[in-house]
Amino acid sequence: MKHTTLIAVSVAALALAGCKKEAPAGDAMATSAATDSTIPGVTPAAEVQRSPSQVFADTAAASDAFEIATSQLAADKASSAKVKTFAQQMIKAHTESSKKLESAAASATPKIVPDAAMTAQQQQVLSDLQGKSGAEFDKAYAAAQVNAHQSTLNALKAYATGGDVAGLKSFATEMIPAVTAHFNMAKGL
């Protein structure tokens, strides 16, 4: 068994080594650029640090995107009228919240642009919800809403007390009562 594994690893290593594309000998610039991973003045994207305010704005934007996407799904898949009504309220509230966030973030210097890309966890929950319907969907949607609103509430409270951009602090403070109400409504679904 060990012999077979060793052979398989060796074959894979040789195959990868054979895939290496060499730059033409006369193309010293291409060779230099391909091997020089530290170009002065350029920070690789993976190493760029986001400010705490950018992280907060991205978290809030992703939360809004998640709430809207899952609530749009509820319009089709939910069986309970109460869940459907709640979902419509969430679409409206989080669309408005997104606009307020963008306005607050634009007041920052330098300007902050919220990234509404959902986290892997949010995408997974959305994917899981897409596979459910009826009462099963209602139960999973309600649980997702409780968890999402609790996380958002925690982020808002933390930024409201410790944030460093006045516009975003005001946004966080303003949103706490609404998100608290949504959290309590979600617990009642």
Give the role of each language-model region.
Residues K2-V9, A13-L189:
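His/Met- and acidic-residue-enriched segments that coordinate or traffic transition-metal cofactors
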